[in-house]
Every structure is written in C-alpha cells, then in structure tokens.
Amino acid sequence: MLIVLTGIDGSGKTTAARALVDSARAEGHHALLLSNHAARRRMSLFSERFGWSLPPRGADFVETCIRVVNVLVSHARALRFDGLVVMDRHLYCQLALRRVAGLSRGRLLPWLLEKLPDPDLTVHLDVDPQHAYERVMARGTDHEELADLEAFRSAYRSLPEFGDSIVVDANGTPEDTLAQLNTVIARKEPVRV
C-alpha cells in the first residue's frame, strides 16, 4: 500500500510519517518511509545566512528539480517494496508552492502525476495556520511567516487534485494524528481471510 502525506509546514507530516512506519513495523509489518523534500528549508537558511535569495522562478526551478528526482527515486523504490510505503510529501506540495508564488502549474508536474502510479491513499494533514506557525517556531530549525502558511493552506485546497485527498485533522497531538491515519488505512485495506 502506498500512502502519500501532504500538508503545510508545521502540519506534522514527517512526524506522522515516521510514526506510521514505526507503528506498522511494531505490528510486524514491512514498512518503508520515503521523503520527497525539495530543500526549501536549506535554501531559506542559506538565504538568511548570506542575505540573498533566489527570485521565485529560480527557487521553484531548484525546488522542482530536487523534488522531482526525489519523487522518481521514491516511486522506483516503492515499486520494489512489498509492504506499507509512506511518502512524506509529493509533487502536490510543489504545485501548492507554485500557486503561493503566483507561478503556473507548468506541464512537467501534471504530466508526471498522470504517469506515476497513483497512491492508494493521499492524506492531507490539515492544521490551523496559527498552530502550524507555533510548531515551526518551537522546533527552531527554520522560519515561516503566518501569512505564508495561510496562503499555502489555501493553495493546497485549491488544487484540482485536492479532491482525491482524505483530510485528517492534524491540530491535535501526534498520537491523535496517528490514530486518525490508522483508521483511514484500516478503511482502505482489504480484509484478509
């Protein structure tokens, strides 16, 4: 089973992905975590440190290249794995980032989404932007503006692909989110006799 997790920064994607894989392994199942980051955090830290940043199109080009390579490698690994595969982020995330930046969808990402195997579940971790902002600031590894998180949330919801996502409320504890994810997966998995 292939599960893709999406959501704004601070929604708990990575925490939920790790917990889901750890939970499955603890129950004796094969599980694999694949991360499809785009190096946004590293680029923003680099920009802060040296006092310059790429223009939106330049940043998108770099992020898209990194994310596409990661997603393609992840799908290749997922095809060879027998068990639960959890992808932390996907191409949908880049499409939402493009929308926030006022850039078009382009042709490559929609084309890849058509060609790549569909996930069994795409789960969007929905969180109030203020709560996400507090989480981001608490972890202290990067910085986000509240307005950007609000725009990112709206961008996700406006994607045509969003209708295929199952929305999970990620405002609670990581344990609450994991419980909701396990419920969603249980509904999707076929009953084995």
For the regions a language model picked out, list residue spans one by one.
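NTP-dependent small-molecule kinase module
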Residues: 130-193
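Conserved lysine of the Walker
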Residues: 13
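ATP-dependent small-molecule kinase phosphotransfer cores
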Residues: 32-103, 107
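Hydrophobic positions on the alpha1 helix immediately C-terminal to the Walker A/P-loop
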Residues: 16
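A glycine- and Lys/Arg-enriched "phosphate-lid" helix/loop adjacent to the NTP-binding pocket
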Residues: 94-157
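Post-Walker A helix-loop "phosphate-sensing" segment adjacent to the P-loop in P-loop NTPases
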Residues: 22-33
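P-loop (Walker A) phosphate-binding loop of NTP-binding proteins
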Residues: 8
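Hydrophobic anchor at the beta1->P-loop junction of P-loop NTPases
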Residues: 5
